């Protein structure tokens, strides 16, 4: 056993998990990204089906996390309300009226449902979480559908007809992913000299990562808004807001995981963790980009 201590390849073993994890992350992206882009290209009910599946998977991850806490929100009710938001996004003309009716009915039904539970020690918290999770998941995904619209992309020989809705959704996806990537690598570059951003929620987050990630988001938005004919200063402003929204989304999910004493939300995406781990920034970014598109006349 003594000679094993001097094995020439032993110093390399600590790096093996990192290389393996990076390989898994890359493989997951190479497989998943074309699938996501294909559904974004198709739009309409095809994209609705994809987001519906994502909604179910994220709800299951939240269910698993909540089981590790003392809270018991009615996540099936959250799922139904979130799915209702998705359906309404497919009918934008009728959406305002139906939204008011749906939210009103949800409030009236959820209150007696949760408070009829015994014992009722956490009934008020469970009621609040039931509604909060519906908005946390369903509202951002419905914003993606509203941004995309139902005009399908078309291929014409050597060129493509890309609807504006595709560019808006790409702006959400690639804008937030560029922020995540920049924040991760730039934050790591300053490890040991960083300034913590929210140490009690996520010790690994730092101000250097936020600034670096936001700069990457700004550059991404400048490039991706060119087909939308937005002025450069609007693209810069959008990049800054997308960066801040991405960090808020990341910290929000980290807070949920900390409550559950969990490192990842799940294991659905090898190398990345769960669906929520990959989409936390997108949930907040989609709402911001949708509001922005309405303000500039999307």
Predicted regions and their residues:
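Juxtamembrane interface at the ends
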Residues: 184-189, 254-262
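Interfacial loop-to-transmembrane junctions
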Residues: 259-282
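Juxtamembrane boundary at the C-terminal end of a transmembrane helix
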Residues: 291-298
């Amino acid at each position: 056993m003594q000679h094993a201590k001097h094995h020439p390849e032993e110093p390399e073993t600590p790096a093996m998990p990192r290389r393996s994890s990076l390989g898994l992350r890359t493989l997951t992206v190479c497989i998943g990204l074309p699938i996501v882009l294909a559904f974004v290209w198709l739009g309409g009910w095809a994209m609705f089906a994809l987001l519906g599946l994502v909604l179910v998977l994220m709800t299951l991850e939240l269910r698993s996390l909540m089981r590790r806490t003392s809270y018991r929100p009615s996540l099936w009710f959250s799922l139904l309300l979130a799915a209702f938001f998705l359906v309404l996004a497919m009918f934008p003309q009728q959406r305002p009226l139906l939204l008011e009716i749906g939210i009103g009915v949800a409030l009236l039904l959820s209150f007696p449902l949760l408070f009829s539970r015994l014992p009722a020690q956490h009934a008020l918290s469970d009621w609040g979480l039931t509604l909060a999770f519906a908005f946390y998941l369903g509202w951002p995904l419905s914003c993606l559908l509203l941004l995309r619209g139902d005009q399908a992309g078309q291929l014409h020989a050597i060129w493509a007809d890309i609807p504006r809705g595709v560019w808006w959704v790409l702006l959400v996806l690639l804008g937030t992913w560029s922020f995540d990537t920049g924040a991760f690598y730039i934050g790591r570059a300053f490890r040991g000299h960083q300034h913590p951003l929210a140490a009690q929620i996520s010790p690994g987050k730092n101000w250097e990562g936020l600034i670096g990630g936001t700069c990457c988001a700004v550059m991404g938005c400048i490039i991706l808004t060119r087909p939308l004919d937005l002025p450069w200063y609007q693209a810069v402003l959008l990049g800054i807001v997308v960066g801040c929204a991405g960090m808020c989304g990341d910290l929000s999910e980290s807070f949920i995981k900390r409550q559950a004493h969990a490192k990842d939300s799940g294991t659905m995406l090898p190398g990345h963790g769960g669906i929520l781990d990959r989409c936390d920034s997108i949930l907040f970014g989609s709402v911001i980009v949708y509001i922005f598109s309405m303000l500039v006349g999307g």
